[in-house]
Every structure is written in structure tokens, then in C-alpha cells.
Amino acid sequence: MATACVIICGGGPNPALDQIDNLIKAYDQVYFVGADRGALRIVRAGYELDVGLGDFDSVSEEERQVIKAHSQEFQAFPSEKDDTDGHLALDLAMNRWPEADYVALGFLGERGGRLDHFLANIWLAHQPRFQAGLSRLTLLEAHHKVRFLEPGQHVLAYEPCLYLSVISLTPVQGLTIQGAKYTLPATDYASPQSLISNEYKASQEPVEIAFESGLVMIFWVNQV
């Protein structure tokens, strides 16, 4: 079965563009959606855009024309709107390619981005429009990778990282962590919890996460 990935580049500073080649090798088909200045960064990295969109208030008119020239489809929005450019891009990607995986670059702002944008991009997990594709969304930066887990059993294959953090966005029931340096028996949490700085074992065995209800984020962290 053919696999597809949509790479969405937001406007955060220094997105992990060096990860794109690895993604291209991993999938049969890769699509590019750029939001505002993120669109320009994709073009400058040498890739053509399937869709360039946003209000383009962070680029010059000349840069806007460059984006337009390298976009198969170009969508301009007013600067005063009830959405962020990044969320518009993700919404479009999930509707146009509903079976794909989604990798969002420049959404975490780990190197100087706005904290309010960071929180908006974490809390998008609660928006109904993103639910269908949430389990296939990865937020990827140079030192962090974030995925969202829904209730059930999940096996996290070993990945080189300093820390593996488990953070709930809601109350959770029956959360267990097995195979990690620090394990957790089935535990209920009545409020969101941050179980950070766990690790894979030296044996590099998978980590198993399970829970009965709630919403959980996994952070792979390569930063002290």
C-alpha cells in the first residue's frame, strides 16, 4: 500500500528543514504545504509547494510573489481572521489528504518562537476538526518530536533521544508505562500530568504506553 506524508511548514523560526530528505525517503509520496513565512522557507530549501497559504504578513511583496510562483495552489487570507496560518494549513492538509501522515515543522518554536503560538499548536489537539488525523500528526523540530496518543495500547520503538516524556492533556484513566527506565503501574489522574524526563533503557527495548481514556502527548527530547 502506498504511503503518503504531508509536510506542513509553519512560520516559527528555524524549522527543521534538514529532516525533509529523510521524510522523502520514508514515504512513497510527499506533499508540501507552506503557511506564511513557512512557505518561503520551503521554497528557499529547494522544494516546490503543493499549496502556499496564509495572510503573508511576515513576508515582503517580493517574497510573496516568489511563494506564489513556486506554489501549485496559492491561497491568500486576510490578516484579521479567526485562525492562525498554521492551523489553516493543517486543516487543509487533513481535508485534502485524509489518509496521509502529517509532519508539522516550525510549530513548536523551540528556538525563539512565540509561546502563545506554541500553546495554540499544542492545544489544537482539542479541536474537533483535527481529531480524525490527530494520531497521524507529528510536530517535529531539531531537538523535539511530539506525537499525540489516543486511548489504547501503544508500542514506542526505540529512538535515539535523551529523554522520553509523557504528558497528558486531559484527565486519564489506567495510564501505564512499561519497558522504560521508570515504569508506571495503572494509574488514574484527575488532571493533566507531566511525567517528564523518562528514558529508554540501555538495551534499547520498546516502551509500551497504555491508557483507557484521555489524551496523551509523547515528547522525544534531545536537549538537556
What residues fall within each predicted segment?
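N-terminal beta-strand-loop-alpha-helix module at the start
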Residues: 1-66
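Structural motif
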Residues: 9-12, 107-108, 221
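Histidine-anchored nucleotide/phosphate-binding helix
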Residues: 20, 37-43, 89-90, 118-126
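A glycine-rich helix N-cap at a beta->alpha junction
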Residues: 69-78, 161-168
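Short phosphate-binding loop-to-helix
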Residues: 74-97
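Anionic-ligand-binding alpha/beta catalytic cores of soluble enzymes and soluble regulatory domains
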Residues: 101, 105-155
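Long, charged alpha-helical interface segments
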Residues: 142-144, 148-224
